[in-house]
Design a protein with these regions (language model features):
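Conserved active-site and cofactor/substrate-binding residues in soluble primary-metabolism enzymes
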Residues: 35-38, 42, 121, 125, ...
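Generic secondary-structure signature for well-ordered alpha-helical cores
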Residues: 45-52, 135, 139, 169, ...
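Short cysteine/histidine-rich metal-coordination sites, predominantly Zn2+-binding motifs
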Residues: 224-229
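Metal/cofactor-centered catalytic core regions of large enzymes
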Residues: 34, 74-78, 210, 215-216, ...
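Short terminal or interdomain "cap/linker" segment that borders an active site or interface and mediates
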Residues: 141-219
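Active-site helix-to-loop segments that bind/position phosphate- or nucleotide-bearing substrates
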Residues: 1-112
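Conserved mixed alpha/beta catalytic, RNA-binding, or beta-rich assembly cores of soluble enzyme
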Residues: 83-147
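Short conserved micro-motifs at the rims of enzyme active sites and ligand-binding pockets
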Residues: 101-102, 221-223
């Protein structure tokens, strides 16, 4: 099977942004108060208008991904246990969202932070929509998928981002690039891998101990987890 080629995935822009999720990214505890809700609603309109969601994906066998250096670390291997192949996925909201976040923050720090939270929520919505499309594709093939697993989870290093981007040809197909520090640009972008199997698989669910946000997580400070919200 080897790797690729990458293919575009059609994404429809949602009618709205998940404000509850954005409030959590914003740091609202126990739900947004009236002022926070109003701020998020106000900032959501121009941010959604600025979004141009795009996604690309490919299928590859695990041996080829390993040989390419993409499956570095033990945790991603655990996630792919029982799988015969994997899908690579990249999703981006486009440069307009980054620009809108910067505009919103000029002279209004709260609006900038709110817009950033909204962008994160919208990126997750786009990734969920892309994953749903891939699950439909897998079902037509009689296949099953694990959940998404992204660089930075567990010991899967961010250093694989350039390899993922190159395999998916994200610069040409989606305008998505990787900086010298292995960060994605546009910033509101997500890359991930999903295992493919002939039987139902769950994948390795990274708990709090593996989360890249564990040292600054607001949920952990409150003695709960994001999964419980």
């Amino acid at each position: 099977m080897s790797i690729g080629p990458s293919m575009p995935l059609r994404l429809e822009k949602p009618e709205g942004i998940d404000l509850a999720q954005a409030a959590r990214y914003f740091g609202a505890r126990g739900g947004a108060d009236a002022a926070t809700q109003a701020l998020l609603e106000k900032c959501a309109v121009p941010l959604l208008a600025a979004a141009t969601p795009r996604a690309v994906w490919l299928e590859a066998d695990l041996d080829s991904l390993t040989a390419a250096g993409i499956l570095a670390g033990e945790d991603v291997a655990k996630h792919l246990e029982g799988c015969t192949a994997a899908l690579l996925l990249a999703v981006t909201l486009g440069p307009g969202v980054d620009a809108q976040i910067r505009r919103a923050g000029v002279g209004d720090i709260a609006a900038g932070v709110a817009s950033d939270a909204l962008g994160s929520a919208l990126a997750e919505q786009a990734a969920e929509a892309a994953e749903a499309e891939l699950r439909q594709w897998a079902a037509r093939q009689g296949k099953y998928l694990t959940g998404r697993y992204s660089p930075g989870y567990g010991d899967w290093p961010l250093a694989v981002q350039p390899l993922l981007a190159a395999a998916l040809d994200t610069a040409r197909r989606a305008g998505l690039c990787v900086t010298e520090n292995n960060l994605l640009t546009p910033r509101k972008s997500i890359t991930a891998i999903l295992g493919v199997s002939d039987h139902p698989v769950r994948g390795h669910l990274a708990g709090c101990g593996h989360c890249v946000l564990r040292t600054r997580c607001e949920y952990r400070k409150r003695g709960i987890t994001c999964a419980s919200e």
